[in-house]
From Swiss-Prot:
InterPro entries: 4-PPantetheinyl_Trfase_dom, 4-PPantetheinyl_Trfase_dom_sf, ACPS, Ppantetheine-prot_Trfase_dom. The keyword Transferase applies. This is Holo-[acyl-carrier-protein] synthase. GO terms for cellular component: cytoplasm. One of its GO terms (molecular function) is holo-[acyl-carrier-protein] synthase activity.
Amino acid sequence: MAIYGIGTDIVQVSRVAAVLERTGGRFAEKVLGPDELRVFHARRARSEARGIAFLATRFSAKEAFSKAIGLGMHWPMTWRALQTLNRPSGEPYVVASGELADWLAARGITARVTVSDERDYAVSFVIAETGLPAPDAPTAVSRTTP
C-alpha cells in the first residue's frame, strides 16, 4: 500500500454546540450519516456534552478525510456520504456510500482514521492509502539546494 494522502482537522467543540443550537438540531442531520445520527442521539440522550463531542469528532473526521483524498468538500465527497463508526473494541473506521464509495473504489483508496476530543477541542487524523499509483504523485521527493 502507498499513502494517497493525509488529512488532519481540529474543531472547537463550543462552535459545534453553537451551530447545533442555532439550527435547532438540523446541523447534526446535515452532517451525520444514518448510523452516526443514531449514535449521536443515543449519546446525547445520556449526556449532552458527550453527544456534542461525538458530533464534533465526526465533523472533524469528515474534514480530515476530505483533505486526505484531495477533494475538500466537493462532489462526490459529501457530509453524509462518509461515516466514522466504531468497532466493538472502540477503534474508529470509515464507511463510504454512494458515489463517494464508487470514486474511492475506482482509485483503490482505503483509509485509516483516528479521532480524539477533550473539553474544548476535537481532532482527527486520516491516512488515505491506495494500492494503485496516484496519477500526479511524485516519484521521489525533490530537494532544493541553497
